[in-house]
Amino acid sequence: MVRTINETFLKACRGERTDYVPAWYMRQAGRSQPEYRKIKEKYSLFEITHNPELCAYVTKLPVDQYNVDAAILYKDIMSPLPAIGVDVEIKSGIGPVIDNPIRSLQDVEKLGEINPEDDVPYILDTIRLLTTEMLDVPLIGFSGAPFTLASYMIEGGPSRNYHNTKAFMYAEPKAWFALMDKLADMVITYLKAQINAGAKAVQIFDSWVGTVNVADYRVFIKPAMERIFAEVRTMGVPMIMHGVGAPHLVNEWHDLPLDVVGLDWRLPIEEARARGVHKAVQGNMDPSFLLAPWSVIEEHVKGILDQGMKQPGYIFNLGHGVFPEVNPDTLKRLTTFIHEYSKGQLAK
Protein backbone atom coordinates (compact mmCIF):
# COMPACT_ATOMS: atom_id res chain seq x y z
CA MET A 1 0.00 0.00 0.00
CA VAL A 2 1.34 3.46 -0.96
CA ARG A 3 0.59 6.08 1.69
CA THR A 4 -0.02 9.76 0.94
CA ILE A 5 2.46 11.85 2.89
CA ASN A 6 2.89 15.52 3.75
CA GLU A 7 5.74 16.61 1.46
CA THR A 8 6.45 20.04 2.96
CA PHE A 9 9.78 18.85 4.35
CA LEU A 10 10.81 17.31 1.01
CA LYS A 11 9.86 20.47 -0.87
CA ALA A 12 12.03 22.53 1.45
CA CYS A 13 14.91 20.09 0.93
CA ARG A 14 14.60 20.68 -2.80
CA GLY A 15 14.68 24.45 -2.33
CA GLU A 16 11.02 24.88 -3.28
CA ARG A 17 8.61 27.37 -1.75
CA THR A 18 6.42 26.06 1.07
CA ASP A 19 3.35 27.44 2.86
CA TYR A 20 5.13 27.20 6.20
CA VAL A 21 8.54 26.22 7.54
CA PRO A 22 8.78 22.46 8.17
CA ALA A 23 10.35 21.34 11.42
CA TRP A 24 11.81 18.23 12.99
CA TYR A 25 14.29 17.80 15.83
CA MET A 26 17.41 15.70 16.11
CA ARG A 27 16.88 13.11 18.86
CA GLN A 28 13.16 13.92 18.76
CA ALA A 29 12.56 10.24 19.55
CA GLY A 30 14.08 9.35 22.86
CA ARG A 31 15.23 10.50 26.22
CA SER A 32 12.91 13.46 26.80
CA GLN A 33 9.75 11.36 26.32
CA PRO A 34 8.15 9.61 29.32
CA GLU A 35 6.85 6.85 27.03
CA TYR A 36 10.37 6.21 25.78
CA ARG A 37 11.82 6.13 29.29
CA LYS A 38 9.27 3.49 30.25
CA ILE A 39 10.32 1.39 27.26
CA LYS A 40 14.00 1.79 28.23
CA GLU A 41 13.20 0.42 31.68
CA LYS A 42 12.41 -2.90 29.99
CA TYR A 43 14.48 -2.87 26.79
CA SER A 44 18.02 -1.91 25.83
CA LEU A 45 18.88 0.16 22.75
CA PHE A 46 19.96 -3.08 21.07
CA GLU A 47 16.64 -4.75 21.86
CA ILE A 48 14.58 -1.78 20.66
CA THR A 49 16.41 -1.40 17.35
CA HIS A 50 16.25 -5.15 16.68
CA ASN A 51 12.46 -5.21 17.17
CA PRO A 52 10.82 -3.56 14.12
CA GLU A 53 7.42 -3.05 15.78
CA LEU A 54 8.93 -1.47 18.89
CA CYS A 55 11.46 0.58 16.93
CA ALA A 56 8.73 1.83 14.59
CA TYR A 57 6.63 2.87 17.59
CA VAL A 58 9.53 4.84 19.08
CA THR A 59 10.28 6.46 15.71
CA LYS A 60 6.66 7.53 15.19
CA LEU A 61 6.04 8.77 18.74
CA PRO A 62 7.35 12.33 18.20
CA VAL A 63 5.40 12.66 14.95
CA ASP A 64 2.20 12.05 16.89
CA GLN A 65 3.21 14.10 19.93
CA TYR A 66 4.95 17.10 18.37
CA ASN A 67 3.36 17.26 14.89
CA VAL A 68 6.80 17.41 13.25
CA ASP A 69 7.11 17.30 9.47
CA ALA A 70 9.52 14.37 9.25
CA ALA A 71 10.42 11.26 11.22
CA ILE A 72 13.99 10.07 11.60
CA LEU A 73 14.68 6.39 12.04
CA TYR A 74 15.46 5.49 15.65
CA LYS A 75 18.83 3.76 15.69
CA ASP A 76 22.46 4.39 16.54
CA ILE A 77 25.15 5.50 14.11
CA MET A 78 27.15 2.44 15.18
CA SER A 79 24.45 0.02 14.01
CA PRO A 80 26.13 -1.08 10.74
CA LEU A 81 29.65 -1.53 12.13
CA PRO A 82 29.30 -5.09 13.50
CA ALA A 83 28.45 -6.18 9.95
CA ILE A 84 31.95 -5.27 8.77
CA GLY A 85 33.69 -6.88 11.74
CA VAL A 86 33.78 -4.18 14.42
CA ASP A 87 33.09 -5.40 17.97
CA VAL A 88 31.03 -2.54 19.39
CA GLU A 89 28.99 -2.30 22.58
CA ILE A 90 26.87 0.66 23.71
CA LYS A 91 27.67 1.08 27.41
CA SER A 92 25.37 3.11 29.64
CA GLY A 93 26.93 6.39 30.68
CA ILE A 94 29.86 5.95 28.30
CA GLY A 95 28.58 5.41 24.77
CA PRO A 96 30.04 3.16 22.08
CA VAL A 97 33.00 1.05 23.19
CA ILE A 98 35.00 -0.94 20.63
CA ASP A 99 37.02 -3.97 21.72
CA ASN A 100 39.14 -4.22 18.57
CA PRO A 101 40.27 -0.66 17.71
CA ILE A 102 42.02 0.01 14.42
CA ARG A 103 45.78 0.30 14.79
CA SER A 104 47.24 -0.62 11.39
CA LEU A 105 46.63 -1.18 7.69
CA GLN A 106 46.28 -4.88 8.49
CA ASP A 107 43.40 -4.09 10.83
CA VAL A 108 41.70 -2.12 8.06
CA GLU A 109 42.19 -4.91 5.55
CA LYS A 110 40.42 -7.34 7.89
CA LEU A 111 37.21 -5.32 7.70
CA GLY A 112 34.47 -6.86 5.59
CA GLU A 113 31.54 -5.54 3.57
CA ILE A 114 27.96 -4.95 4.61
CA ASN A 115 25.01 -6.78 3.09
CA PRO A 116 22.08 -4.88 4.60
CA GLU A 117 19.37 -7.46 3.86
CA ASP A 118 21.42 -10.10 5.70
CA ASP A 119 23.24 -7.98 8.28
CA VAL A 120 20.66 -5.39 9.37
CA PRO A 121 17.29 -6.78 8.20
CA TYR A 122 15.58 -5.41 11.32
CA ILE A 123 16.45 -1.85 10.26
CA LEU A 124 15.03 -2.35 6.78
CA ASP A 125 11.94 -4.07 8.19
CA THR A 126 11.39 -1.09 10.50
CA ILE A 127 11.59 1.29 7.54
CA ARG A 128 9.14 -0.80 5.52
CA LEU A 129 6.70 -0.96 8.42
CA LEU A 130 6.84 2.79 8.98
CA THR A 131 6.55 3.83 5.36
CA THR A 132 3.84 1.39 4.29
CA GLU A 133 1.59 1.35 7.35
CA MET A 134 2.34 4.07 9.88
CA LEU A 135 3.70 7.44 8.72
CA ASP A 136 2.05 10.35 6.93
CA VAL A 137 5.31 12.34 6.89
CA PRO A 138 8.62 11.44 5.20
CA LEU A 139 11.02 9.11 6.97
CA ILE A 140 14.66 10.17 7.10
CA GLY A 141 17.27 7.43 6.97
CA PHE A 142 20.75 8.18 8.20
CA SER A 143 24.33 7.11 8.69
CA GLY A 144 27.36 8.31 10.54
CA ALA A 145 30.04 9.87 8.35
CA PRO A 146 33.32 8.01 7.73
CA PHE A 147 35.36 10.41 9.87
CA THR A 148 33.15 10.07 12.95
CA LEU A 149 32.87 6.29 12.53
CA ALA A 150 36.64 6.04 12.04
CA SER A 151 37.17 8.13 15.18
CA TYR A 152 35.25 5.62 17.29
CA MET A 153 37.03 2.73 15.60
CA ILE A 154 40.49 4.18 16.24
CA GLU A 155 39.93 5.68 19.70
CA GLY A 156 37.99 2.63 20.90
CA GLY A 157 35.19 4.87 22.16
CA PRO A 158 34.32 8.52 22.80
CA SER A 159 37.22 10.97 23.12
CA ARG A 160 37.73 14.56 24.21
CA ASN A 161 40.26 15.52 21.55
CA TYR A 162 40.60 12.66 19.03
CA HIS A 163 44.39 12.77 19.19
CA ASN A 164 44.70 9.10 18.27
CA THR A 165 42.47 9.56 15.24
CA LYS A 166 44.38 12.52 13.90
CA ALA A 167 47.74 10.94 14.68
CA PHE A 168 46.68 7.86 12.68
CA MET A 169 45.51 10.12 9.85
CA TYR A 170 48.85 11.94 9.69
CA ALA A 171 51.21 9.03 10.41
CA GLU A 172 49.47 6.26 8.45
CA PRO A 173 47.95 7.93 5.38
CA LYS A 174 47.79 4.70 3.38
CA ALA A 175 45.87 2.97 6.15
CA TRP A 176 43.71 6.09 6.69
CA PHE A 177 42.60 6.32 3.07
CA ALA A 178 41.97 2.57 2.99
CA LEU A 179 39.74 2.99 6.05
CA MET A 180 37.91 5.95 4.48
CA ASP A 181 37.29 3.87 1.35
CA LYS A 182 35.97 0.92 3.37
CA LEU A 183 33.65 3.13 5.38
CA ALA A 184 32.49 5.06 2.31
CA ASP A 185 31.56 1.76 0.65
CA MET A 186 29.63 0.74 3.76
CA VAL A 187 27.79 4.07 4.05
CA ILE A 188 26.82 4.04 0.36
CA THR A 189 25.44 0.50 0.53
CA TYR A 190 23.72 1.17 3.85
CA LEU A 191 22.01 4.38 2.73
CA LYS A 192 20.91 2.91 -0.60
CA ALA A 193 19.31 0.00 1.25
CA GLN A 194 17.43 2.40 3.54
CA ILE A 195 16.16 4.32 0.50
CA ASN A 196 15.11 1.13 -1.27
CA ALA A 197 13.21 0.14 1.88
CA GLY A 198 11.27 3.42 1.85
CA ALA A 199 13.31 6.28 3.35
CA LYS A 200 12.40 9.51 1.55
CA ALA A 201 15.54 11.45 2.53
CA VAL A 202 18.88 10.66 4.18
CA GLN A 203 21.12 12.56 6.57
CA ILE A 204 24.79 12.00 7.28
CA PHE A 205 25.96 12.91 10.78
CA ASP A 206 29.58 13.93 11.32
CA SER A 207 29.59 14.48 15.06
CA TRP A 208 33.33 14.98 15.57
CA VAL A 209 34.45 16.59 12.31
CA GLY A 210 34.69 19.99 14.00
CA THR A 211 38.06 18.88 15.38
CA VAL A 212 39.55 18.96 11.85
CA ASN A 213 40.83 22.07 10.08
CA VAL A 214 39.79 23.00 6.53
CA ALA A 215 43.03 21.92 4.86
CA ASP A 216 42.96 18.49 6.49
CA TYR A 217 39.26 18.10 5.68
CA ARG A 218 39.95 18.67 2.00
CA VAL A 219 42.77 16.14 1.89
CA PHE A 220 41.75 13.41 4.33
CA ILE A 221 37.94 13.46 4.50
CA LYS A 222 36.27 15.29 1.63
CA PRO A 223 37.10 12.75 -1.13
CA ALA A 224 35.15 10.01 0.67
CA MET A 225 32.24 12.39 1.30
CA GLU A 226 32.16 13.41 -2.37
CA ARG A 227 31.94 9.78 -3.42
CA ILE A 228 29.18 8.99 -0.92
CA PHE A 229 26.96 11.88 -1.94
CA ALA A 230 27.61 11.39 -5.66
CA GLU A 231 26.68 7.70 -5.56
CA VAL A 232 23.68 8.03 -3.23
CA ARG A 233 22.44 10.98 -5.29
CA THR A 234 21.51 8.53 -8.05
CA MET A 235 18.71 7.27 -5.77
CA GLY A 236 16.81 10.53 -6.25
CA VAL A 237 16.07 11.50 -2.64
CA PRO A 238 17.21 14.65 -0.78
CA MET A 239 20.49 14.36 1.09
CA ILE A 240 21.40 16.34 4.20
CA MET A 241 24.83 16.92 5.74
CA HIS A 242 25.10 17.78 9.42
CA GLY A 243 28.29 18.27 11.40
CA VAL A 244 28.74 19.60 14.92
CA GLY A 245 31.07 22.43 15.91
CA ALA A 246 32.23 22.95 12.35
CA PRO A 247 31.21 26.40 11.06
CA HIS A 248 34.57 26.55 9.28
CA LEU A 249 33.52 23.62 7.07
CA VAL A 250 30.12 24.75 5.77
CA ASN A 251 31.52 25.87 2.42
CA GLU A 252 33.23 22.50 2.03
CA TRP A 253 29.86 20.80 2.59
CA HIS A 254 28.17 23.21 0.20
CA ASP A 255 30.59 22.04 -2.52
CA LEU A 256 29.45 18.43 -2.08
CA PRO A 257 26.69 17.04 -4.35
CA LEU A 258 24.03 17.26 -1.64
CA ASP A 259 20.77 19.14 -1.15
CA VAL A 260 20.72 20.50 2.41
CA VAL A 261 23.47 22.00 4.57
CA GLY A 262 22.85 21.47 8.28
CA LEU A 263 23.99 24.24 10.62
CA ASP A 264 24.47 24.29 14.36
CA TRP A 265 24.05 27.41 16.50
CA ARG A 266 27.68 28.49 16.14
CA LEU A 267 27.00 30.02 12.72
CA PRO A 268 23.97 32.25 12.03
CA ILE A 269 21.97 31.29 8.96
CA GLU A 270 22.40 34.72 7.39
CA GLU A 271 26.17 34.50 7.82
CA ALA A 272 26.26 31.06 6.20
CA ARG A 273 24.37 32.46 3.23
CA ALA A 274 26.68 35.47 3.10
CA ARG A 275 29.58 33.02 2.84
CA GLY A 276 27.98 31.52 -0.26
CA VAL A 277 25.76 28.74 1.09
CA HIS A 278 22.84 28.91 -1.36
CA LYS A 279 21.51 25.38 -1.06
CA ALA A 280 18.68 24.54 1.32
CA VAL A 281 19.58 25.06 4.97
CA GLN A 282 18.56 23.13 8.09
CA GLY A 283 18.99 24.37 11.66
CA ASN A 284 20.05 25.92 13.87
CA MET A 285 18.61 26.42 17.37
CA ASP A 286 20.84 25.78 20.36
CA PRO A 287 18.95 23.01 22.23
CA SER A 288 19.85 24.72 25.51
CA PHE A 289 17.18 27.32 24.72
CA LEU A 290 14.55 24.59 25.16
CA LEU A 291 15.22 24.79 28.90
CA ALA A 292 14.47 28.54 29.00
CA PRO A 293 11.09 30.21 29.71
CA TRP A 294 8.69 30.18 26.77
CA SER A 295 8.94 33.94 26.20
CA VAL A 296 12.70 33.58 25.70
CA ILE A 297 12.26 30.60 23.37
CA GLU A 298 9.67 32.42 21.27
CA GLU A 299 11.81 35.49 20.67
CA HIS A 300 14.85 33.38 19.86
CA VAL A 301 12.93 31.19 17.42
CA LYS A 302 11.45 34.24 15.69
CA GLY A 303 14.97 35.44 15.01
CA ILE A 304 16.00 32.10 13.53
CA LEU A 305 12.87 31.85 11.40
CA ASP A 306 13.23 35.41 10.12
CA GLN A 307 16.72 34.54 8.88
CA GLY A 308 15.75 31.15 7.48
CA MET A 309 12.69 32.38 5.58
CA LYS A 310 14.63 34.96 3.56
CA GLN A 311 14.95 32.41 0.78
CA PRO A 312 13.11 29.18 -0.11
CA GLY A 313 14.59 25.94 1.14
CA TYR A 314 14.61 26.23 4.92
CA ILE A 315 13.97 23.51 7.52
CA PHE A 316 13.85 24.34 11.23
CA ASN A 317 15.86 22.05 13.46
CA LEU A 318 18.16 22.11 16.44
CA GLY A 319 21.91 22.41 16.09
CA HIS A 320 22.26 19.19 18.10
CA GLY A 321 20.02 16.65 19.80
CA VAL A 322 17.17 17.19 22.28
CA PHE A 323 18.36 17.02 25.89
CA PRO A 324 16.72 14.49 28.27
CA GLU A 325 15.64 17.38 30.54
CA VAL A 326 13.46 19.04 27.87
CA ASN A 327 9.72 19.06 28.58
CA PRO A 328 7.88 17.31 25.71
CA ASP A 329 5.16 19.96 25.92
CA THR A 330 7.78 22.56 24.99
CA LEU A 331 8.57 20.71 21.75
CA LYS A 332 4.88 20.44 20.90
CA ARG A 333 4.39 24.14 21.55
CA LEU A 334 7.53 24.93 19.55
CA THR A 335 6.31 23.08 16.45
CA THR A 336 2.95 24.83 16.61
CA PHE A 337 4.65 28.21 16.91
CA ILE A 338 7.03 27.50 14.01
CA HIS A 339 4.16 26.46 11.75
CA GLU A 340 1.85 29.34 12.69
CA TYR A 341 4.44 32.13 12.74
CA SER A 342 6.09 31.08 9.48
CA LYS A 343 2.76 30.61 7.72
CA GLY A 344 1.75 34.13 8.66
CA GLN A 345 5.06 35.62 7.56
CA LEU A 346 5.23 33.71 4.27
CA ALA A 347 1.67 34.72 3.39
CA LYS A 348 2.58 38.42 3.44
UniProtKB/Swiss-Prot annotation:
GO cellular component: cytosol
Residue numbers binding substrate: R27, Q28, A29, G30, R31, F46, D76, Y152, S207, H320
Main localization category: cytoplasm
SUPFAM superfamilies: UROD/MetE-like
Location relative to the cell: Cytoplasm
Keyword Lyase recorded: yes
Superkingdom field: Bacteria
Top EC class for this record: lyase
A single MF term (Gene Ontology): uroporphyrinogen decarboxylase activity
Site for Transition state stabilizer, residues: D76
Keywords for the protein's UniProt record, in alphabetical order: Cytoplasm, Decarboxylase, Lyase, Porphyrin biosynthesis
Pfam families: URO-D (PF01208)
NCBIfam families the record matches: hemE (TIGR01464)
Record's function text: Catalyzes the decarboxylation of four acetate groups of uroporphyrinogen-III to yield coproporphyrinogen-III.
Name of the protein this chain belongs to: Uroporphyrinogen decarboxylase
Organism: Bacillus cereus (strain AH820)
